[in-house]
Each structure stands twice: as C-alpha cells, then as structure tokens.
Amino acid sequence: WFSDTFEVGTSGQINTQWQPCFTAHGDKTEYESMVKTFAAATIGFMKKKPNVDSIRICQNDVIAGENDVANCTCDACLAAYAHYGNTIAGAMLTFTNDVADKVNEYLDSDQAIADGFSSNKELNIVVLAYGTASKAPVLRNAIGDIVFDEAGKGQPADLYRFIKDDTGAIRSVLQKKENGENEKLTCHKRVTVEYANTTANYVRSFYEVENQLYANAVKSWAGLGGKIYVWLYQVNYHMYFYPYNSFESLVENLRFFKTYNASYVYNQGTFENPNCGGFAKLREYLGSKFEFNCNYNYGEVVDFWFKNYFAEAEPYMRQYFNELQANQRAKESKTGGGIHSNALAGEDIWPQGMINHWVKLFDKAYKAIEHYKETDPEKYEILYKNILIESQFPRLVLCTTYASTYNATQLKVLRKE
C-alpha cells in the first residue's frame, strides 16, 4: 500500500517509496482490504481515545532530512493525478470517503451504541491538502482552469476510479449512481479538508494578487461540501530569528478563510522557541483574538497590546515596530514573502546605522521602566524580559552581518546582553 518507486537525494534514499498509495496500485481487491484496514484502525483508535475528534489522512512529509512530499508514482496514482488536474487529492479524497463510509456505518450501528458512541459523535476524518494534494480535484475547463459556480466556489468533478484490468493496464472507470447519473467527487459525511500550502506568500493576504493561485485552491475546496480546516504559516523557517511581516496579512487571511466557512485554524509560528523576537508575541496575540472574532479592529488590538505589554516603554517599542515594518515593506522586492527563503539577511536589507538606531531605542525603553525596579520588582522583570526578547534581532544582526566591526570582547557582550 506504499509507493514502489524511489528517488535518491543528498542524504541517500528518500521517502518517495514510503508515500502511501491511495489507489493500491489499481488492484481492486487490495484497495478494498486497505480501506477496511484503515477504517478498522480508525475505529480502534477512536475506542482508545474517545475524546479525539479529528484523524488526519495525509502524505509523508520529511524523511531522512529531505523535504519530499511527492506522491506515489504507480500507474493508477499517476492516472488519478493527471485526470484531476495534476493533483493527488482526487485519489486521497476518494480513499478517505471510502474509509469514512465504513466508519459512519459503524457509528450508525447498535455495536457503536454498545461501545458508548452515539450516531452523531463529532469525528472529522481529515484530508490534508498539502504538497501534491493542495489543489482540489474539481471541475476544470478544456485548458485546465477551474470552473467556479455563482458563489465563487469550485464545482465537484465526476468520480472516477483507476482500476487495473486483466491485462494489468489501468482503466479509468466513471462511477454511476443507481439512477444512472454520474457520481460526483465530494466530501462524504465526516470528511474534512485541511488546507496547508507552504509556497504561498504569507506577508500578503489571500485577497491579494500574489496569492490568487492559492486563494483559488481554497475556493475550489470550499465547493466540495466538507468542513474547511486551515494550516497557516507565520515565520520564515530558514531564518527563524528574523522578523516576518505577517501581522496584518494574518488578520486578513483569517477573514478570508472565514468567508469560506473555515472552522479551525492552526497558525504555525515560532513553536520551537517561545521567546523569538520580531514581535512573535504580538502575532500570537493577534491570532488569539482574531481566530475567535474576525471583526475586531486591527489597529485597536495592536494599540492595546503595545500599551499593556510594554507599559511606559510603549512609545519606543512602537517606534521600533513601525520602523521595522516600514523597512520590511520597502525591501520586500528583495526579501520576498516565502517561508523557506534565505533572502532576509544582508547589509542592503539591514543598514548598520538603522540597527544602531534601534539599539538606542531599546536603551530608552529600558530607562522608561527603570522606576519599577524599586516600586514593583515583579512588574519590572516582566517588562524587562518583554523588551529583551525584542532586542534579540538587532543584536543578532550586529553579531553576524556586522561582526567584523567589533572585537571579541564587544561581540561577547552583545551576545550575552
């Protein structure tokens, strides 16, 4: 039930051979066995962890240090991939629907009641629309463009299964309803789609032209009838400690996805380090507010955060934030907005004079809270740490880009401050 091909990367064999084959290589008997096995495993997991409400079906992501999300390349998977517009999502959704049908059959049974489940149990079997599955398997015209309905959503395509015949050749078989109509590929009961795209520009919103391709993918998935989950990205993962200007776009993206009935959002940020600079804490706060109510006023929320997070140091920290954003916008043609980029550093992006100016702003910020040392030491420590976290980025630039302008003692001080 896995791909029988592989590629060789810089670290040796990589994970194409370990990608799941969602068609069972076109073998009808093996496919039925695969569906039964996965459905039984899902039901078994549900019994062990009855409070879990979502189970994901996805491709493998990163194995042996290689970022390889290629799909299975057997003849059946390649046929499905080509048929649905260069996406493996058609095969994935078909398989997920078949699994869900069997899980639903169990949940509607007397046995499920005896096991302590009701027929309306909350359970989402989630197709991860990621990698080569990010494009929806929807109706397209002769040149491959998506055909949207009047509401601007994708329209379901006819359902085909890709089955090996007696000669071993793969045949595409159109599925028919009992009334003779073509069956459509839609999300069955309890099937949910989670959209996750790592190639979008997350310093821009999905309303903007830079992300039109990805916005259209979301609109396409929204037409297939299932819930929409969203996995968003909020940092450049190749340059983790550099600022990523996704504050306003984060809010606009939440509003965009809400328009298409998204019910769950995971904003992946600096999860490996809880104390990154670049105003990661502000981004987390924005998520905590706007994920529950997209109608807040962005400016008012940002103002509230700065006043309460930095107290008397707010004017200096807000000036730093505003200038940081202005510089990022001005240099966006050089840095881009990708989350896997090495273009964020350099003297042309961060002039030394500007960095030194920001360091002086931090000195003023520390001085503004100095009086709390005596009057409220606990508050002082909190505010001091909040400022210190944000000071990491300009000091990082001085210690790396401009390291040659300091002696060893000075660099040691910068790194330890």
Name each region found by the language model:
Residues W1-W18, K227-H238:
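N-terminal small/glycine-rich loop or linker at the start of catalytic domains
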Residues N261, G287-E417:
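Catalytic domains of carbohydrate-active enzymes that cleave complex glycans
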